[in-house]
Regions:
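Short Cys/His-rich Zn2+-coordinating modules
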Residues: 21-35, 56-67
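Short, flexible, mixed-charge glycine/proline-rich loop motifs
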Residues: 32-43, 67-73
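Short, cysteine/histidine-rich loop/knuckle motifs that typically chelate Zn2+
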Residues: 47-48, 81
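Basic, short loop/linker segments at the boundary and entry of helix-turn-helix/winged-helix-like folds
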Residues: 53-113
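Extended interfacial segments that mediate partner engagement and assembly in macromolecular machines
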Residues: 87-126, 130, 134-136, 141, ...
Length: 428
């Protein structure tokens, strides 16, 4: 959704009739037919013996929805031949649940878009249903939301794995740390207390994600904190089997040894680039810490700054060596600030590292696709704080990534488009 002032959408205006607000209910597909939300679908014949059903009893169900609490008169049916019981189906309500599916969906949007924990998602739901479902409002509790999240994960998993998104031939892979585990339960199982130092090492996991330039997330793998090459091979193999041979032309990652080794084994013929965006960011940070803005950097220091950036972006060993020699000359001939001396020390560290990658055939890449994705994902994960089990984290990731693939950009030239829509618009 776009930001700032927008004109009022008059198509969404509600009418007031006899002191009541009239809200037209949306229609949803049930078995390839459209039905108004919360309408009743009654069974007619037994699914076992095909006999016509008889009414057994009447029952009024109260459904908690984002529109308020809705009462629906339903019937229970019985087969006269085999005594099998049936009941009416309320469109938009799964089984005998007290909450409607759309209410659960809105709570999930609150959780992911609002970067909320399960408990905070419940509190927000209570706020926007004040006077509708209860005096203080009522929303699915943390346990109900968690259970709904686990069920929804199977749908999200299929969406993610069946996603047929076109791209420009370049894929981006990176990992980020998340916290997981239940300390008290683990201590009980091993019959001893775990120190804080041990717990910090034990509770971290890494979520490795593969995405396109359009920020469409294709797949992920949860590994140990510092994974081996073998831990990432299943993820890359799934991606290799998903696309025709020759479709993937380049893979971009950071200097992670596990990624480099796994890519070399699974994609030996594909060009592998290493992302230098974070190197550029680290250099810039040293200057921003001292001068706060590029405009405030003295001319001598600007020369050093530009030369270090050229060094980082160098795509040949010769050009990289030339840039490094220029930096050393500037260091010896010019009066420089502390920021420049810190930046030059950092440049000396990364020079040898980048040369080693260039010798192996790697090329530098300045695209910050994965940094943008993980800055968003990391914000959600930090505030979710609900990962007691690995299966819970896996299901959360399936839901989160499927949600972000369909979530529209709020800023930039692609505002109003989701990553999937952007990919379809660009590549058809």
């Amino acid at each position: 959704m776009g930001r700032g002032n927008k004109t009022i959408d008059k198509l969404m205006v509600k009418t007031i009739f006899e002191d009541n607000i009239l809200i037209p209910l949306p229609k949803v597909f049930v078995e390839n037919r459209l039905f108004p939300l919360f309408s009743i679908i009654s069974p007619t014949h037994c699914d076992s013996c095909s006999a016509k059903l008889n009414v057994n009893s009447h029952y009024t169900r109260f459904i908690l929805t984002s529109y308020g609490t809705i009462a629906r008169n339903t019937k229970y049916w019985i087969c006269p031949n085999c005594n099998k019981s049936f009941h009416d189906q309320i469109v938009g309500v799964t089984g005998s649940a007290n909450y409607s599916d759309e209410f659960y969906d809105k709570q999930n949007f609150v959780r992911y878009d609002g970067r909320c924990s399960l408990n905070n998602s419940c509190r927000i739901g209570e706020r926007y249903t004040e006077g509708l479902t209860d005096i203080c409002g009522r929303a699915p509790c943390a346990s109900s939301l968690w259970l709904h999240e686990q069920k929804q994960a199977s749908v999200s998993k299929q969406e993610l794995l069946d996603l047929d998104s076109d791209f420009d031939g370049t894929l981006y892979i990176d990992g980020d740390w998340v916290k997981i585990g239940w300390k008290n339960k683990l201590e009980t199982s091993i019959c001893r207390e775990i120190t804080s130092k041990e717990w910090k090492k034990m509770r971290y996991r890494s979520v490795y994600t593969i995405a396109t330039k359009e920020k469409v997330i294709l797949d992920f793998e949860i590994t140990d904190r510092l994974p081996t090459i073998e831990a990432l091979i299943p993820l890359l193999t799934r991606i290799k089997n998903r696309f025709p041979e020759g479709k993937i032309k380049k893979i971009v990652s950071d200097e992670d040894k596990a990624i480099i080794g796994a890519v070399k084994l699974v994609f030996p013929e594909v060009v592998h680039s290493f992302c230098v965006f974070h190197q550029l960011k680290n250099v810039s940070k040293r200057y921003y810490d001292e001068f706060e803005s590029v405009k405030n950097i003295p001319e001598n220091d600007k020369l050093v700054y530009k030369e270090i950036c050229k060094l980082i972006k160098s795509d040949t060993i010769i050009y990289s060596v030339v840039c490094f020699q220029n930096i050393l000359e500037l260091e010896s001939n010019l009066e420089l600030s502390k920021a420049s001396h810190k930046a030059i020390s950092y440049a000396k560290e990364i020079f040898e590292k980048n040369i080693a990658f260039l010798k192996k055939g790697f090329t530098p890449e300045t695209d910050n696709t994965m940094e943008q994705i993980f800055s968003l994902i990391g914000d959600v994960v930090d505030k979710a704080r609900s990962f007691k089990t690995e299966s819970g984290l896996t299901n959360f990731c399936y839901n989160l990534f499927a949600h972000f693939n369909k979530r529209c950009f709020c800023t930039g030239k692609w505002v109003g488009f989701s990553p999937i829509m952007r990919a379809r618009f660009q590549y058809g």
